[in-house]
C-alpha cells in the first residue's frame, strides 16, 4: 500500500515511528506537510496537489493534524476522502474531538462519565456557574488550549470569579469543571486503536502542579487499567467516531471520568514509558480496513 502521513513535522518521533511501522510491513510511506497541500475542488475529479505535482495512488492516510491548523487540516483530510482514500481518522471525527465543548456534549449524550462541566457567555452568570460545578476549587479551561496550556486551578470562589471575569473580558471561550481532588494531579492516558486499548500509562504532574501533561514536565509510568476504564476509553473514541485516539481518564471516587479525547495523541511518551509499539497496530488496522474496502468494491463490481 501507499500510505500518506499528514504531518508538518517529519523529524518528530511520532512521524518517524509511523514511517518505520509502514515500511516494516512492506508499505510505501510518504510524509506530507498538510499546510503545503492545495486542492482542486470540482464535481468530476477532485484532487490534491503538493510541491507542484498531483498526489495520486494513495490507499490510506494517517492524519497527524496539529491543533493550530485544524480547519485547514480537516479540509485536506476531507479532500482525500472525496478522492476515495481511507483516512485512519476522518475529517468529521477530528473536528468533533477538537471542539472541546462539542466533544463533552457527545460524551454526555452517550452517558459516559466526565467531570461536571459548565459553559457560559455572560459575566453575570459567574456565581451560578461556579455553584453549578460544585464550587471552588475548580478548573478553568480555554477551549482552544492544548497540552495543559490555558488551564487554571482556582482554589477559592474569589479567585475563580476573578479568572473567569478576566477570560470573558478578553472574549475568550472558556469552560469550568469540577476539580477531582482525589486524582492528585495524575491521569491515565489510554492509546486506542479501533476497539482496543493497545497501551496505557499513568501521568503524574510535577510537584505542586495539578496538570499531568508530559509536555509540562510531568512523568509517566506503565499502569494496568481496570475493565471499566478500558470499556470507557473505547466508548469515548467510538462516540467521537475516531479510530486512533488518546483518551485521558481521571480516577475519581465515583469511578473513571473522561477528561479529553485526543485525535493526534503523542506517541513518544507512551511508547518509551510502556515499551509497547502503538504504531504497528495503527498500520495493521489500516491494512484490515483497506482490504475490506477493496473486497466490497470487488463484490459490487
From Swiss-Prot:
Residue ranges occupied by any ATP-grasp domain in the UniProt entry: 104-287
One Gene Ontology term of the molecular function aspect: ribosomal S6-glutamic acid ligase activity
PROSITE patterns listed in its UniProt record: ATP_GRASP
UniProtKB keywords: ATP-binding, Ligase, Magnesium, Manganese, Metal-binding, Nucleotide-binding, Protein biosynthesis
UniProt: Mn(2+) 1 binding residues: 248, 260
Residues bound to Mn(2+) 2: 260, 262
Alphabetized Gene3D superfamilies for the sequence: 3.40.50.20, ATP-grasp fold, A domain, ATP-grasp fold, B domain
Cofactor note (record): Binds 2 magnesium or manganese ions per subunit.
Cofactor: Mg(2+); Mn(2+)
GO biological process: protein modification process; SOS response; translation
Residues that bind ATP: 141, 178-179, 187, 211-213
GO cellular component term of the entry, any: cytoplasm
Membrane-crossing segments per the record: none
Superkingdom as given in the UniProt entry: Bacteria
Family the entry assigns: Belongs to the RimK family.
HAMAP family in the record: RimK
UniProt name for this protein: Probable alpha-L-glutamate ligase 1
Organism this protein belongs to: Shewanella sp. (strain ANA-3)
Gene that encodes the chain: rimK1
